[in-house]
A protein has these predicted regions:
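His/Asp/Glu-rich, glycine-adjacent segments
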Residues: 11, 16-18, 88-226, 232, ...
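Active-site-proximal N-terminal segment of extracellular/periplasmic enzymes that hydrolyze or transfer
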Residues: 14-68
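Beta-strand elements within well-structured catalytic alpha/beta cores of enzymes
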Residues: 32-49, 63, 87, 129, ...
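Secreted, luminal/periplasmic, and some membrane-associated catalytic domains
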Residues: 33, 40, 78-79, 102-116, ...
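Glycine-/proline-rich flexible loop or hinge segments
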Residues: 42-46, 65-71, 79-83, 101-114, ...
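Short, solvent-exposed loop/turn segments at secondary-structure junctions
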Residues: 42-45, 77-78, 93, 142-146, ...
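Short, structured active-site-proximal loop/turn typified by the sulfatase FGly-forming signature C/S-X-P-X-R
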Residues: 49-90, 137
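Low-complexity, glycine/alanine/valine/leucine- and proline-rich hydrophobic stretches
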Residues: 360-421
């Protein structure tokens, strides 16, 4: 998606002199018009390409012609929590600390979800904007992100579509969301969950007009439907409809994704899985190594807790380099790295990953033990994410950005930079 328009040498990006906000070693201009940043969960760029080409996204077609369209890299592991937090902090996991949906807490010796703000090591831009006196609203599809995205958000609105029936003024900054949006509570396993996010965002912009709004969807559709299929095109047509209405209200819109999505099956259509816990048990004895799958969250029906990234804790007598060398001999493994190598390559907090990191190839996922994964909920060929093969994501702004260096490596966590510093 190349950038359209004629870059002007007279256009200058915002500089520290006219910026009012400094967060995580980056500077931002304060919003002068409503800014909406959208994270479309699982949005492989081809979803947009197919939907636009087949006439399902007229608004997006116009934006790509007149605005800014880039392909960026998200962070690895290509999962929801680390990338959403990268977007709202403007920084990689090595700065904000959220390295997965799930981790092994070595201090307590337990495996835990990374939903608690205690794991966050950096302030969010959303909280900083609220502290600067700006009206901030956050709507996320799944409630697992709400506390992280809303951390230290003073006076703002922050709720999830999943639990929109439980909103309270004192907790979420708003109440009676179902009545206000005039939609029923959606199922967490449906496209309706994401549509509720967009409908809520549109209602908030019409009735509260926040200065900055962050919308984060769910990838239920992307896990089930490939780009260009009727199910996928219907989802993106719905999204296009809401984004067009937000645009008509005068919003600067920056759209990106937390990760892409790929089929993870063999030619027979069956899931192509490397069960790492079984592999390590066979190599070095049962239970001596601990495999952690950072994709793990409460919503496993559509992916079976199978993703393309894993981290492994080894006993002292097992050399990390030896383990990596053996893994690299296995078909389906793209890369196996020691802790130090993985932290440097993927910008991860070294103290929150195992002794080694394993990333599988595009059509392969990583599991723990075969007996621990229930794939009975899969009613379509497995599609998932987590690896390097899901790193490419769209980065789109509904405004031209003359002077922008489109040749540099852009990241999904540059979304607020583009919206606040270039598009206004």
């Amino acid at each position: 998606m190349p950038q359209k328009g004629n870059p002007s040498p007279n256009k200058q990006p915002a500089t520290p002199k006219n910026m009012n906000l400094h967060v995580n070693h980056r500077s931002y201009a304060l919003p002068r018009q409503p800014v909406v940043v959208v994270c479309v969960d699982g949005c492989e760029p081809d979803y947009l390409g197919q939907a636009v080409a087949n006439g399902h996204m007229p608004w997006m077609k116009g934006v790509l012609a007149e605005g800014t369209g880039l392909v960026a890299d998200c962070v690895v592991p290509t999962f929801t929590n680390p990338n959403n937090l990268s977007i709202v902090t403007g920084a990689p996991p090595s700065v904000h600390g959220i390295c997965g949906n799930f981790l092994y807490d070595s201090a307590s010796g337990t495996e835990v979800m990374m939903n608690d703000p205690k794991w966050l090591r950096a302030p969010t831009l959303l909280a900083a904007l609220a502290d600067a006196g700006k009206k901030v609203a956050v709507v996320t599809a799944k409630d697992k992100l709400r506390l992280l995205l809303g951390h230290q958000l003073k006076g703002g609105i922050c709720f999830s579509a999943e639990k929109a029936d439980q909103t309270q003024q004192a907790v979420h900054g708003i109440e009676g969301v179902l009545e206000k949006v005039a939609r029923p509570l959606p199922s967490v396993y449906s496209a309706d969950l994401s549509e509720f996010v967009f409908a809520s965002g549109l209602w908030l912009m019409r009735h509260h007009r926040p200065d900055v709004m962050y919308l984060s969807t769910t990838d239920y559709i992307q896990h089930k439907h490939a780009p260009g299929t009727p199910g996928a095109n219907a989802f993106y047509a719905m999204m296009d409809h809401y984004l067009g209405q937000l645009d008509a209200l005068g919003c600067v819109i920056a759209l990106t994704a937390d990760h892409g999505m790929n089929a993870k099956v063999g030619m027979d259509g069956r899931p192509q899985v490397i069960y790492l816990q079984d592999w390590f048990d066979c190599q070095w004895g049962a239970g001596r190594c601990r495999v952690i799958l950072p994709i793990t969250d409460p919503y496993v029906v559509h992916h079976g807790a199978l993703g393309s990234f894993a981290t492994v804790y080894l006993p002292e007598d097992v050399s990390p380099q030896q383990a990596c060398d053996r893994l690299m001999q296995d078909q389906g493994v793209e890369v196996a790295l020691t802790r130090q190598e993985a932290a440097a390559r993927f910008e991860l907090p070294a103290d929150r990953i195992g002794d080694i990191v394993v990333v599988s190839e595009r059509f392969t996922v990583l599991g723990s033990s075969e007996a621990r994964h229930d794939l009975s909920g899969l009613d379509a060929p497995l599609r998932s994410h987590g690896g390097i093969s899901e790193q490419k994501v769209p980065l789109i702004v509904n405004r031209p950005t003359p002077g922008l260096d489109t040749r540099r490596r852009w990241r999904n966590f540059d979304a607020f930079d583009l919206a606040l510093n270039w598009a206004q």
